[in-house]
């Protein structure tokens, strides 16, 4: 906002991701901070807050500058505990509230999600960077928290490293995703992209 942009916030609820993708597709968005990509965990694993298989594609295909992070890819969203499919019975869960139960993604699922995130970023026709917060990708994946799983997080990171297009920068940031420093770096990266876009269009 200090740089003169109107900032819109979209919650990663499935509907939120679809709404954001639609606005980007309509040409109403100058740049995207796509930091909470958790809807892909629901899409891939089978949660209730998926945004569809084209999530992460609108900015890429339309050349809109973007900064992408794997925010909350450690979790899949379900409703009350008794509504969770039986096939997930042995998994690690965290009850966020009586209506929402979160399930930890496994290392294998994280590797698959890293491939998907990379594939979507690789579609980009405009400037894009990927930021990876190495200390935690969510509040509850930090050290001492219930979803702390360095092996799964490393599988996610390695899959992104392996599959990301070589001309797309991957920044490993030694913070949690909610640290002020991470937010600053993400915002400055996007503003740098937008500055270049503005300069080139003059």
Language-model-detected regions and their locations in the chain:
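Metallocofactor- and cofactor-centric catalytic cores in central/energy metabolism, strongly enriched
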Residues: 1-69, 77-80, 90-91, 102-202
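Conserved anion-binding
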Residues: 74, 95-101
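Active-site gating loops and adjacent loop-to-helix segments of metal-dependent hydrolytic enzymes
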Residues: 87-96
């Amino acid at each position: 906002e200090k740089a003169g942009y109107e900032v819109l916030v979209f919650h990663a609820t499935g509907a939120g991701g679809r709404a954001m993708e639609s606005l980007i597709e309509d040409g109403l968005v100058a740049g995207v901070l796509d930091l909470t990509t958790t809807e892909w965990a629901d899409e891939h694993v089978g949660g209730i807050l998926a945004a569809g298989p084209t999530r992460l594609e609108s900015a890429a295909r339309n050349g809109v500058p973007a900064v992408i992070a794997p925010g909350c890819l450690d979790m899949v969203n379900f409703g009350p505990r008794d509504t969770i499919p039986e096939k997930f019975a042995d998994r690690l869960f965290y009850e966020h509230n009586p209506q929402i139960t979160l399930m930890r993604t496994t290392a294998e699922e994280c590797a698959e999600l890293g491939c998907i995130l990379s594939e979507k970023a690789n579609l980009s026709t405009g400037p894009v960077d990927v930021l990876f917060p190495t200390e935690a990708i969510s509040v509850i994946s930090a050290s001492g928290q219930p979803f702390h799983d360095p092996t799964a997080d490393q599988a996610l990171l390695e899959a992104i490293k392996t599959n990301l297009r070589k001309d797309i920068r991957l920044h490993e940031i030694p913070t949690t995703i909610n640290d002020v420093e991470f937010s600053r770096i993400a915002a400055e990266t996007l503003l740098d992209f937008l500055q270049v876009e503005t300069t080139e269009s003059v």
